[in-house]
Amino acid sequence: MSILKKPDLSDPILRQKLAKGMGHNYYGEPAWPNDLLYMFPVVILGTIACLTGLAVLDPALVGEPADPFATPLEILPEWYLYPVFQILRIVPNKLLGIVLQSMIPLGLIAIPFIESVNKFQNPFRRPIATAVFLFGTVFTLYLGIGAALPIDKSLTLGLF
């Protein structure tokens, strides 16, 4: 098995695109040993050094002690669960909310099969995958921002 990814040059459509100058004539350098031995350890050690430096220079506070007698008006989950919380909050039927959330991983699993005819890795040459990614990112940000707002403003984000 080769370390380099090589395209199927017997495909006539791909050969026509390569003849027009579309595609890559150079397929990169091998991952072993260039990336795995030299670049990854530098990036990992640099990340650890940055995190250690930030932790030493500005330690995070634990927070204020919990008061069991002061309940907030609206309880919110952690920030990374805001989009999921917003789906459950705005969908009228809770079973439909669960079904919608189970469709997200199924849709992500289906993307490679939908886009399997495309032999390019460049995102600008993969319009379906790029469109799904951009739509999912914008929609997730929309749901996350809406979850932080009160329920009457969460669908419109308070804009109208």
Curated annotation (Swiss-Prot):
Keyword Lipid biosynthesis: no
Stretches that traverse the bilayer: 36-56, 95-115, 131-151
Example GO BP: photosynthetic electron transport chain
Cellular localization per UniProt: Cellular thylakoid membrane
Topology in the lipid bilayer: Multi-pass membrane protein
Keyword set includes Transmembrane: yes
Domain of life of the source: Bacteria
Subunit composition and interactions: The 4 large subunits of the cytochrome b6-f complex are cytochrome b6, subunit IV (17 kDa polypeptide, PetD), cytochrome f and the Rieske protein, while the 4 small subunits are PetG, PetL, PetM and PetN. The complex functions as a dimer.
Family of this protein: Belongs to the cytochrome b family. PetD subfamily.
NCBIfam families: cytb6_f_IV
Name assigned to this protein: Cytochrome b6-f complex subunit 4
Species annotation: Synechococcus elongatus (strain ATCC 33912 / PCC 7942 / FACHB-805) (Anacystis nidulans R2)
Gene name of this polypeptide: petD
